[in-house]
Every structure is written in C-alpha cells, then in structure tokens.
C-alpha cells in the first residue's frame, strides 16, 4: 500500500547533529546518584548530553541501561547502537525547546496512521486478516481510553478519511499530558510504526513491543510469508523496528 510513502519521518535531534562514530575515549562506565536523579559516569566523570547538559535520569534502572550501552562500545562509539541514550538526549535537549513542534509532528501521523488503512480482502486477504487482528483492537482501545475515534478507510483506499476534529483534540490532550520523557518515547514509537495509535497503545501498556511490531508491520510480514525474506533488506528493517519499539517501551517504563 502506498500510504507508507505519504509521510516522511522528521529528523530527530541526533540525526540533525549527525551520528558519526568516534574512537572510544574511556575505560570504565558506572552510575551514581545526583540528588533525586541518577547519572552515568565515564572514568568517574559525569556523562553530559550531546548539547552539553547534565544527563540526569529519573531511575537507576534507566541509568544502568544507558551505562550498559556505553560499556558495550568497543573501539569506536556508534551512536546508532545506543537508542536509550538517544531517547534520553531527545527528552533533555530537544523536547523542552521544541515541545509544541514535537507534539505537532506526532499528531500529523493521525491523518496517515497505519491502523487506519484497510486492504481489499479479495486482493490481499492475509494483509486484511492481520489488519483486522492487530489494528481494530488498538483503535478500539484508543477510542475507549482517550476518546479518539480514528476512522478506518474504505477497503483498498489509498487515503484514510479526514481525521475528525474531536479525535485530533483528544490526541492533542493525550500528548500534552505526557512528561518530556514519555513524549520522547511516543515520538520514537510513532515515527517507527507510522502510527500515533500504536505509539499510545504501547505507552499505555495495551500492547507490548512485540505487539507494536506486529501491528506496525502487517503488510511486510504478509509479503514475507508470501514471497520470502530478502536478506539485507527485510531483516535489517525488522531489526531496526524491533530495537526502536523495544527501546521506546523500556524507556517509557523506566521513566514512569
């Protein structure tokens, strides 16, 4: 279906800065308390955010996980291999300055939300089966929990119907209620799944990361089952989606 191409992903703060690797410059990683927060240390020095701010984390669990990401770097530091560090940096560096724009970027996905598209059952029966299995319960949860009724499109349609203003208002309220940490997680999950419905369901514990992955990839999974896996393409995409959604889920839970 062509709706996947209708919206490009806005660049994250890390992407705008660039994500070039650099040599590892430290030997030891650890964590310590910083008042009511936790911080990661590299050779006993506090780790700052990319913008130079203090990386003050709300839980020991998150600090340990980010320290583990830094400890796992071998000869070179690869930012792409540290999704939790990226989320924390986004929450601290980007969102306080660009909160309204971040919310706007997330809400824009309502118009082309993955869960709103319906395949023609006669032409794509397996895609349609998976859409009904995964998307309908998420939309029902969104309607019941947040009062946002994202109407599904006609079977085979390339565009979803206009988003009801009441639904957009409800989604706006849901985003506004989130902390900066949770908004960072929602942004990542929404951009990866191309669905604010899936993102909110993941943060709301209606689905887990595995369920979010299945809902986000109904077309890809059906096509792989029919035509087979293309190594170096499908497997790479699956790994990326899996890591990003699992990281968003963990990050949201560790900052609750």
Regions found by a protein language model. Give the residues of each.
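Long hydrophobic alpha-helical segments typical of transmembrane helices together
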Residues: 213-256
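Internal, conserved structured core segments that host functional sites
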Residues: 100-170
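A surface-exposed, charged beta-strand/loop segment in the N-terminal or early-internal portion
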Residues: 45-119
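An internal, amphipathic alpha-helical element
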Residues: 161-231
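Short aromatic-glycine-(Arg/Gly/Cys) micro-motifs in beta-strand/loop hairpins
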Residues: 32-48
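N-terminal mitochondrial targeting presequence
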Residues: 1-21
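Short N-terminal "domain-start" leader segments
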Residues: 24-33
């Amino acid at each position: 279906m062509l709706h996947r191409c209708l919206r490009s992903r806005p660049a994250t703060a890390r992407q705008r800065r660039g994500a070039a690797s650099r040599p590892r410059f430290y030997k030891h990683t650890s964590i310590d308390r910083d008042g009511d927060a936790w911080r990661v240390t590299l050779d006993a020095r506090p780790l700052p955010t990319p913008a130079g701010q203090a990386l003050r984390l709300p839980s020991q669990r998150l600090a340990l996980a980010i320290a583990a990401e830094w400890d796992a770097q071998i000869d070179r530091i690869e930012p792409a291999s540290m999704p939790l560090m990226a989320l924390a940096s986004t929450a601290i560096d980007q969102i306080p300055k660009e909160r309204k724009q971040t919310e706007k970027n997330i809400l824009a996905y309502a118009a082309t939300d993955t869960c709103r598209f319906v395949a023609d059952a006669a032409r794509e029966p397996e895609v349609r089966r998976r859409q009904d299995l995964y998307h309908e319960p998420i939309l029902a949860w969104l309607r019941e929990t947040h009062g946002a009724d994202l109407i599904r499109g006609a079977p085979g349609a390339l565009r979803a119907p206009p988003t009801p203003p009441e639904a957009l208002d409800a989604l706006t309220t849901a985003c506004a209620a989130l902390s900066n940490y949770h908004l960072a997680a929602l942004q990542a999950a929404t951009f990866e799944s191309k669905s604010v419905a899936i993102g909110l369901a993941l943060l709301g514990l209606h689905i887990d990361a595995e369920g979010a992955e299945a809902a986000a990839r109904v077309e890809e999974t059906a096509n792989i089952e029919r035509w087979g896996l293309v190594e170096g393409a499908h497997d790479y995409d699956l790994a990326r989606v899996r890591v990003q959604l699992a990281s968003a889920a963990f990050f949201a839970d560790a900052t609750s």
